[in-house]
Amino acid sequence: MNRLLASALLVGSAVVAPVSAACIKNATVTEVDVAIIGGGASGVYAAARLIDNNKTVVVLERNADRIGGQTETYYDPTTGTPVNVGVKVFSNTTVTTDFLKRFDFPMGTLNVGQTLATGTQYVDFATGKLIPNFTAVVPAVQAAAMQRYAAELAKYPQIKFGYNLGPQVPEDLVLPFGKFMEKHNLTGMAQTMFEFNSGYTPLLEIPALYILKYLDTYELQSLQSGSFIVAANGDSATLYRNAAKFLGERVVYGVSGMHIQRSSAAGGRVTISVGNSTTGTHMIRAKKLIVAAPPTLDNLRSTGLDLDTTEAGLFGKLSAGVFYSLVVKDTGVAKANLRNRHPANPYGFPDQPFIYSVIPLPKTSGLAQVLLGSASPLTASQVEARVAADIGRLPASLRGNATSVPKVVTMAAHTWNVMAPVADIKAGFYDKLEGLQGLKDTWYIGAAWATQSSTTIWEGLEQEFLPKLLAAL
C-alpha cells in the first residue's frame, strides 16, 4: 500500500465526523480486493494468506499502535519482564506452527494441568478464608471424564468451525453445561473446565454448545497431552509485532470512524470512507469486506457498517461476557497461586462477577496477575473495587503481612463468548446468521464464529473460509 493511503488514514484518536456524499465523491480512492475490519488473530491470518494468493488487502485497526486483538502484553517498567494479559497458549497443529514459524515466534511448551496443580492454594475470596484439603483434580477420574467428553464432542462435527446446526438443533447442545456434565458423567473434569474456560461465566448455566466449541478437539488434545505452545520469551505479542512488519502499510492504525456502503447487486463494490478534519477523507473500494470483529450490534454499528433490518435484528440477539486480565501491585501475594472457590456452591464455583485467581509474577517488581470474569461488562472502577476488596480481605499469612490497598496497573478487557438466547438457538438463529456469509460481498470471521482459540480460528480459515472467499473473488 502506498504512503499516501497510509498517511491519509492515520486518524489517531480523533472522532471522525459523518461523511457526506460530496466528501466521498471528491475523495482519493484506493482499490483493493479485500478490506478487513479488525487486526486480531482472524484478521491478520486472513490478510497474510490472501496476500499469499496475490490479493490486495487493507486491514483497518482501531488500536493506534498495534495489531493482535486479544493478544496483549504488559511490560513491567522496573524489570522489563513481559506479562501476557491476553492470549497465552496455542494448540499444537501444523497450521498453527506454520503460522508461528512464519513470523519467527519463539515457541516453548506449557503443561496446563501441571501448572494448575503446582503451588496452588484455594481460597474463598468472598470471606478471605482458606479452604483446606480442597481436591480440585483426581487425575484418573479426570482422564476418564475427558474420554467421555471427547466421545460427546465427536457427535457434533458440524460445529467445529461454525454453527451449522440445521433445522433440528440437538437438545443436548442447548442444555445448561452443568446439566450436560451430569447427564454424560463429566463432573470429574469440572474443576479443570472451570479454570480452562475462564471467561465463560456462569459456567454451569451456559449452553453446552458454547463450551463444546471452546474446548474443541484441538484444545482437548493439547489438554490431554499436556502440551500447549507458548512464547518462549514470555511475550505472545511477538507474533503480531513481526506480522505487522510483514503487512507494513497495508495496516491502517487508529481508525476511529468509518462509513461503509455495500451493494446488493452482483459484482458491486464495498465502499469505505475514513478520515478526519486534519487528513481529509480517503475512500477505499473493495471487492469483498471481511468483518473480523466481535459481531455485537453496538460494535458493528460503531464500525459504520450499513446494517439492514435483517442484519441488525440478528446481530441484536447476540450478547457477550467480559474477561478481565489484570496486572496488580501491592497484593502481597508472593508464594502461592490463589484460586477462588465458594464451598457452599455446586463444585465450589464462586458467584459472578468474581476473581478466578491471583498469580504472583516472578521476575517482576512484586506484581501479580489477576483474572476476573463477568457475564456483563463492568466499569473500570467496579473492577478495581472488586480486586481491592477481595484481595484486601485475604489473611495476613497469604499477603505477607501487606497492609497496602492493591492497585490495578493495567487492565485488558476482552469481549468473551458471544452468545444467543437459547430460545433463538432452538428457532434456527444460527442457520439465519450463517446465511449472511457472502451477502452484500461481506464475510464474517473470528472468535464469535469459531471460538476463543487462535488455533481453531486459523484452522477454520484455512480449511473452510478462505477457499470459499477466494472462489468468490
From Swiss-Prot:
EC number(s) given by UniProt: 1.1.1.-
Disulfide-linked positions: none
UniProt biotechnology annotation: Diterpenoid pyrones display various biological activities and subglutinol A shows insecticidal and anti-HIV activities.
Cofactor(s) needed: FAD
GO MF term set: oxidoreductase activity
Sugar-bearing residue positions: N26, N54, N92, N133, N185, N276, N401
Top-level taxonomic group: Eukaryota
Pathway in which the depicted protein is active: Secondary metabolite biosynthesis; terpenoid biosynthesis
Function: FAD-dependent oxidoreductase; part of the gene cluster that mediates the biosynthesis of the diterpenoid pyrones subglutinols A and B. The first step of the pathway is the synthesis of the alpha-pyrone moiety by the polyketide synthase dpasA via condensation of one acetyl-CoA starter unit with 3 malonyl-CoA units and 2 methylations. The alpha-pyrone is then combined with geranylgeranyl pyrophosphate (GGPP) formed by the GGPP synthase dpasD through the action of the prenyltransferase dpasC to yield a linear alpha-pyrone diterpenoid.
Name by which UniProt lists this protein: FAD-dependent oxidoreductase dpasF
Organism encoding this protein: Apiospora sacchari
Organism phylogeny: Eukaryota, Fungi, Dikarya, Ascomycota, Pezizomycotina
